[in-house]
Amino acid sequence: MSCLKIITLFLFLAAVIASSIANQKGKHRVGAPEQINPNDANLKISLAKAISSQNAGVVVVKITKATRQVVAGFKYVVEFVAKVAGTNKQKVCRTVYIEQAWLKKTSVKNFSCK
Protein backbone atom coordinates (compact mmCIF):
# COMPACT_ATOMS: atom_id res chain seq x y z
CA MET A 1 0.00 0.00 0.00
CA SER A 2 1.34 3.38 -0.88
CA CYS A 3 2.18 5.94 1.77
CA LEU A 4 -0.56 8.27 0.48
CA LYS A 5 -3.22 5.56 0.82
CA ILE A 6 -2.11 4.77 4.38
CA ILE A 7 -2.26 8.45 5.37
CA THR A 8 -5.70 8.84 3.74
CA LEU A 9 -7.01 5.76 5.55
CA PHE A 10 -5.59 7.02 8.85
CA LEU A 11 -7.22 10.45 8.43
CA PHE A 12 -10.56 8.86 7.52
CA LEU A 13 -10.51 6.62 10.60
CA ALA A 14 -9.52 9.56 12.81
CA ALA A 15 -12.48 11.57 11.47
CA VAL A 16 -14.90 8.69 12.09
CA ILE A 17 -13.65 8.24 15.66
CA ALA A 18 -13.81 12.00 16.37
CA SER A 19 -17.36 12.17 15.02
CA SER A 20 -18.41 9.22 17.16
CA ILE A 21 -16.93 10.77 20.30
CA ALA A 22 -18.65 14.11 19.60
CA ASN A 23 -22.04 12.38 19.21
CA GLN A 24 -21.57 10.48 22.46
CA LYS A 25 -20.91 13.71 24.35
CA GLY A 26 -24.40 14.99 23.52
CA LYS A 27 -23.50 17.38 20.74
CA HIS A 28 -26.50 18.63 18.79
CA ARG A 29 -27.31 16.63 15.69
CA VAL A 30 -28.76 18.29 12.61
CA GLY A 31 -32.55 17.91 12.55
CA ALA A 32 -32.78 16.72 16.16
CA PRO A 33 -34.91 18.64 18.68
CA GLU A 34 -32.90 21.11 20.75
CA GLN A 35 -33.70 22.65 24.13
CA ILE A 36 -34.29 26.37 23.95
CA ASN A 37 -34.26 28.98 26.69
CA PRO A 38 -37.79 29.47 28.08
CA ASN A 39 -37.02 33.21 28.32
CA ASP A 40 -36.19 33.53 24.60
CA ALA A 41 -38.07 36.55 23.20
CA ASN A 42 -38.76 34.88 19.83
CA LEU A 43 -40.21 31.84 21.60
CA LYS A 44 -42.60 34.05 23.58
CA ILE A 45 -43.76 35.79 20.40
CA SER A 46 -44.32 32.56 18.45
CA LEU A 47 -46.11 30.95 21.42
CA ALA A 48 -48.43 33.96 21.68
CA LYS A 49 -49.33 33.52 17.97
CA ALA A 50 -50.01 29.81 18.48
CA ILE A 51 -52.22 30.43 21.53
CA SER A 52 -54.19 33.23 19.86
CA SER A 53 -54.97 30.97 16.91
CA GLN A 54 -56.60 28.50 19.32
CA ASN A 55 -58.86 31.04 21.07
CA ALA A 56 -57.79 29.25 24.24
CA GLY A 57 -58.66 32.03 26.67
CA VAL A 58 -55.40 31.64 28.57
CA VAL A 59 -52.51 33.96 29.33
CA VAL A 60 -48.98 32.57 29.65
CA VAL A 61 -47.59 32.95 33.16
CA LYS A 62 -44.34 31.02 32.71
CA ILE A 63 -42.78 28.81 30.04
CA THR A 64 -41.33 25.77 31.81
CA LYS A 65 -39.82 23.77 28.94
CA ALA A 66 -39.37 24.25 25.21
CA THR A 67 -37.75 22.47 22.29
CA ARG A 68 -37.32 23.49 18.67
CA GLN A 69 -36.68 21.23 15.71
CA VAL A 70 -35.94 22.13 12.11
CA VAL A 71 -38.58 20.56 9.86
CA ALA A 72 -40.34 22.41 7.04
CA GLY A 73 -39.97 25.44 9.30
CA PHE A 74 -39.54 25.22 13.08
CA LYS A 75 -41.46 22.67 15.13
CA TYR A 76 -41.93 23.84 18.71
CA VAL A 77 -42.98 21.73 21.68
CA VAL A 78 -43.72 24.05 24.59
CA GLU A 79 -44.87 23.36 28.14
CA PHE A 80 -46.08 26.33 30.14
CA VAL A 81 -48.17 27.52 33.07
CA ALA A 82 -51.14 29.64 32.03
CA LYS A 83 -53.78 31.67 33.78
CA VAL A 84 -57.37 31.36 32.62
CA ALA A 85 -58.36 34.80 31.33
CA GLY A 86 -60.38 36.80 33.86
CA THR A 87 -59.54 34.48 36.78
CA ASN A 88 -56.63 33.52 38.99
CA LYS A 89 -56.99 29.83 38.10
CA GLN A 90 -53.79 28.37 36.64
CA LYS A 91 -53.35 25.39 34.33
CA VAL A 92 -50.39 23.45 32.99
CA CYS A 93 -50.48 23.51 29.20
CA ARG A 94 -48.59 21.87 26.35
CA THR A 95 -48.65 22.78 22.70
CA VAL A 96 -46.97 21.53 19.55
CA TYR A 97 -46.89 23.85 16.56
CA ILE A 98 -44.99 24.47 13.36
CA GLU A 99 -43.95 27.98 12.39
CA GLN A 100 -43.17 28.73 8.75
CA ALA A 101 -41.96 32.33 8.81
CA TRP A 102 -41.54 32.65 5.04
CA LEU A 103 -45.25 31.80 4.64
CA LYS A 104 -46.22 33.87 7.71
CA LYS A 105 -47.97 30.72 8.95
CA THR A 106 -48.24 29.01 12.34
CA SER A 107 -49.98 25.61 12.41
CA VAL A 108 -50.96 24.23 15.81
CA LYS A 109 -50.79 20.42 15.82
CA ASN A 110 -51.73 19.89 19.47
CA PHE A 111 -52.89 22.14 22.32
CA SER A 112 -54.02 20.97 25.75
CA CYS A 113 -54.31 22.32 29.28
CA LYS A 114 -54.93 20.46 32.55
From Swiss-Prot:
MF GO annotations? cysteine-type endopeptidase inhibitor activity
Q: Which Pfam families match?
A: Cystatin
Query: Domain named Cystatin: which ranges?
Result: 31-109
| Source domain of life | Eukaryota
Question: PROSITE patterns, from UniProt?
Answer: CYSTATIN
Similarity comment: family membership: Belongs to the cystatin family.
Note the SUPFAM superfamilies from the entry: Cystatin/monellin
Q: What are the annotated GO cellular component locations?
A: extracellular region
Disulfide pairs here are C93-C113
Q: Report the InterPro entries cross-referenced here.
A: Cystatin_dom (IPR000010), Cystatin_sf (IPR046350)
- From the UniProt annotation, give the residues forming the signal peptide: 1-18
Keywords associated with the record: Disulfide bond, Secreted, Signal
- What's the name of the protein? Cystatin Pr17a
Species name:
Platymeris rhadamanthus
